[in-house]
């Protein structure tokens, strides 16, 4: 059991379960619905090229979503609008997430999102993560959204630009976060990062003293040295306990 005052969740393949969107046939469905079946083959080929370039849908979604729109969908407004609708319909929270968030809230833990979201297709406060939390009625559990674009206060929408340009993979987001938590008398060992990717969620956070929990409910990258490994968020109830602030 680890005692923590602060908790940061990754978004893609962690809070957000993108299984349905891994299937390139989704793009075929879009052009069938638009009455343009002749575009399906080329669109699916472009999607596969982009997936090969970045490795997985969640990476594309968080950092390169504009390329899905411009390259895969050719900037076609109708196709982009339909993709956004289907995307919202298909994205679901990870298994056991709501129950875990209720528990962490009861434990007086400060709950946040720490994402590698590098670009948005609109105002920062209307990004894909905020939209996901709103649609699934999860927003009230979270205090801040920390990204390379800035830190958003979920309650009032204000943006702290001091995080702009920092990233999880380089570790600079964790450096900044460690400094801020120190001002609140929270040690890195009293904060936990929960995510799936070794290079962004586990290794750089652990190197800076944060507790780490590897989520393998969507994809398991193997043993990467995390303090704990979970496949269902309900497991957090037996792993994490709130520490008195």
Where are these regions (language model features)?
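N-terminal helical cap/lid subdomain that shapes the substrate entry/recognition surface
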Residues: 2-99, 106, 122
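Asp-based, Mg2+/Mn2+-dependent phosphohydrolase catalytic module
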Residues: 1-9, 17, 32-37, 75-77, ...
